[in-house]
């Protein structure tokens, strides 16, 4: 099987980001964004998606969390796009429902080459551990755009920590499922068009 890894850096006046991604890893992760709860969520994504991930971001957290979260999403999405490559042999579609106590997240993904993001629901509290809750949805919108995937997500619950964590775990599981190689179509692109 081809090596499905990528390394992406992004440096702006607002952030300095470095990301590595191995789609065929075992969930190893090293994450440091300066936002503890966001680090925890990225670790959950890696662990439950079985991706080896490193993320380092030095951002303008004295302003707020927006630039850090968004730029990590840009870099991780770009790394995903590079790592998945021509998408030959992948399952392409996947869906997961993941609970965390009273909260449940629903995730549907199509590794289609088309950037679409839809989010249904909301978060029960405005912030969790230094992360503005709505930035969790914005992170996945940014990821979907730069990964060129279709991603439909929804959350329901009473505790924003649980809602956001279920969402990150759900995306990890769904993306892992969608990028798994189906030996019956190894080497083929999963599209009647022949290209994605």
Curated annotation (Swiss-Prot):
GO annotation, cellular component aspect: cytoplasm
Family assignment from sequence similarity: Belongs to the imidazoleglycerol-phosphate dehydratase family.
One Pfam family from the record: IGPD
Molecular-function annotations in GO: imidazoleglycerol-phosphate dehydratase activity
Originating gene: hisB
Enzyme Commission number: 4.2.1.19
Protein name: Imidazoleglycerol-phosphate dehydratase
Subcellular location: Cytoplasm
Name of the top EC class for this enzyme: lyase
Gene3D superfamilies: Imidazole glycerol phosphate dehydratase, domain 1
Pathway(s) it belongs to: Amino-acid biosynthesis; L-histidine biosynthesis; L-histidine from 5-phospho-alpha-D-ribose 1-diphosphate: step 6/9
Catalytic activity: D-erythro-1-(imidazol-4-yl)glycerol 3-phosphate = 3-(imidazol-4-yl)-2-oxopropyl phosphate + H2O
Coiled coil region boundaries: none
